[in-house]
Amino acid sequence: LIGDYKVGTSKQYISQIIDSNDIPNLGESMLIASPTGSGKTSAVIKMIKHTSMPVIYVTNRKMALCQFKKDDIKASKGLDVPAELLDSISLGENIIAITYQELAETTYKYKGKKHLLILDEVHCLLEDANFSVYAEKIIRYLKANRDNIARIYLTATPDAVTPVIAEIECESGQEQALFAMDWDTNVKSVFHAYASYKTRLKMVYSMESNWNYINFKLYTPDDTKELADYIKRENEQGTKSLIYVNDISKGKVLQEVLGNTQHIYSDEDKRAEIAEIAQNEKFSDRNLITTKVAENGVSLHDDELNLIVVETLDPITLKQVIGRARVNRKNPREITV
């Protein structure tokens, strides 16, 4: 049974409803499902301070990893570390921060060892399973080591992650749990779906979403000039834009039309630039064209970033990209998507 669940309002931050001492016991898990910008990382950093267990923090992108390291060092040591030094500074004796891919390659190091495992952006275990084997390796590792690991799952898109959680956490009735599971704002459907089955998920924290600050528009993907002209007009008014594309070739076409535009297509070829964006929490040009490398994890605190272009039919990707532009949850500025 799920022990309990709490739901916060769209104007609250997750740290206002979560107890930093409420850390899962070994063999148990917790789900924090709240929108981007609601303070999941800050809440987790506070929880890390309250545990004596070794901690492994895992996320799916280098950009998100830089952001976590920056936030953790600032919270624990009070330091604003230059981007180029992030990799050289230790997070602490008992804290490791790695990507899911790195964990998949090194699970043998942690087999049978007791620790707190924080799985950020955990929906990626489903999203990336179509083109990478790391997700399957990690799920196998989690199921084989449930007794010696305390688990905290973090996601802004819970509807995309419940099947993974059911597979890992349900010890009986998994097929029925997967069939019955659905997600709503109040978490009641998840609660009832698990209620008949033995599960190790003991706590769910959820936050309501607010999309009222978003002004949605549609464009024709093949008409690059029309889109570029719109972006240029917005730039002339002082607006910066984040442009998410599915393939690099489309990004290069937009680069040519928009001019010498800042772009990041891989987290390997522009590590210094990625670290700089994470450090400054904004990009330097009027426009940034990117792919999945900046889909999640990075926080852009820039009041000039008021236009987001997303080339996708996937609502999960849409939510993740919108969430890169951080707004004040109590009084958000208007953003065109």
Protein language model annotation of sequence segments:
Residues P54-L65, T99, T220, L227-V257:
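Conserved strand-helix element at the start of the C-terminal RecA-like helicase core
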Residues Q262-T291:
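Conserved helicase ATPase core of P-loop NTP-dependent helicases/translocases
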Residues P158-Y230:
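Interdomain hinge/linker at the junction between the two RecA-like core domains of SF2 helicases
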Residues E311-I335:
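Conserved SF2 helicase motif VI
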Residues D72-K109, E273-Q279:
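Inter-Walker segment of RecA-like/P-loop motor cores
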Residues I289, V298-T312, T336:
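A short beta-strand element within the Helicase C-terminal
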Residues Y110-A144, A150:
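SF2 helicase catalytic motif II
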Residues T36, T41-A43, M47-K77, A160, ...:
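Conserved Walker A/P-loop ATP-binding site and its immediately adjacent core
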